[in-house]
């Protein structure tokens, strides 16, 4: 009977831990470029919309990535 090969590669961090580390890095970068009051409002909106869920974490990551991308894109082109 065939068996799946055992995973011989290095252990990866769990997805959730990696996601939280990414969120922390994005937050640290965002506070360097945007007013804290804006970021606080964004966080409140996400919390009111998604509650304390992984969907909320994913949403805020996506929004922060987009904000930072647009910010840097405009900063470089001027």
Swiss-Prot record:
Keyword Phosphoprotein: yes
Cellular location(s): Virion; Host nucleus; Host extracellular space
Cellular component, GO, one term: host cell nucleus
Segments for region (Homooligomerization): 1-42
Coiled coil: none
InterPro entries per record: RetroV_VpR/X
Primary location recorded for the protein, binned into one broad class: virion
Modification comment: Phosphorylated on several residues by host. These phosphorylations regulate VPR activity for the nuclear import of the HIV-1 pre-integration complex.
Phosphoprotein in keyword set: yes
GO term, biological process aspect, one: symbiont entry into host cell
Keywords, in A-Z order: Activator, AIDS, Apoptosis, Cell cycle, Host G2/M cell cycle arrest by virus, Host nucleus, Host-virus interaction, Ion channel, Ion transport, Modulation of host cell cycle by virus, Phosphoprotein, Transcription, Transcription regulation, Transport, Viral penetration into host nucleus, Virion, Virus entry into host cell
Pfam families found in the cross-reference section: VPR
Assigned protein family: Belongs to the HIV-1 VPR protein family.
Function: During virus replication, may deplete host UNG protein, and incude G2-M cell cycle arrest. Acts by targeting specific host proteins for degradation by the 26S proteasome, through association with the cellular CUL4A-DDB1 E3 ligase complex by direct interaction with host VPRPB/DCAF-1. Cell cycle arrest reportedly occurs within hours of infection and is not blocked by antiviral agents, suggesting that it is initiated by the VPR carried into the virion. Additionally, VPR induces apoptosis in a cell cycle dependent manner suggesting that these two effects are mechanistically linked.
Misc. comment: HIV-1 lineages are divided in three main groups, M (for Major), O (for Outlier), and N (for New, or Non-M, Non-O). The vast majority of strains found worldwide belong to the group M. Group O seems to be endemic to and largely confined to Cameroon and neighboring countries in West Central Africa, where these viruses represent a small minority of HIV-1 strains. The group N is represented by a limited number of isolates from Cameroonian persons. The group M is further subdivided in 9 clades or subtypes (A to D, F to H, J and K).
Complex formation: Homooligomer, may form homodimer. Interacts with p6-gag region of the Pr55 Gag precursor protein through a (Leu-X-X)4 motif near the C-terminus of the P6gag protein. Interacts with host UNG. May interact with host RAD23A/HHR23A. Interacts with host VPRBP/DCAF1, leading to hijack the CUL4A-RBX1-DDB1-DCAF1/VPRBP complex, mediating ubiquitination of host proteins such as TERT and ZGPAT and arrest of the cell cycle in G2 phase.
Descriptive protein name: Protein Vpr
Organism the protein comes from: Human immunodeficiency virus type 1 group M subtype B (isolate BH10) (HIV-1)
Chain's gene name: vpr
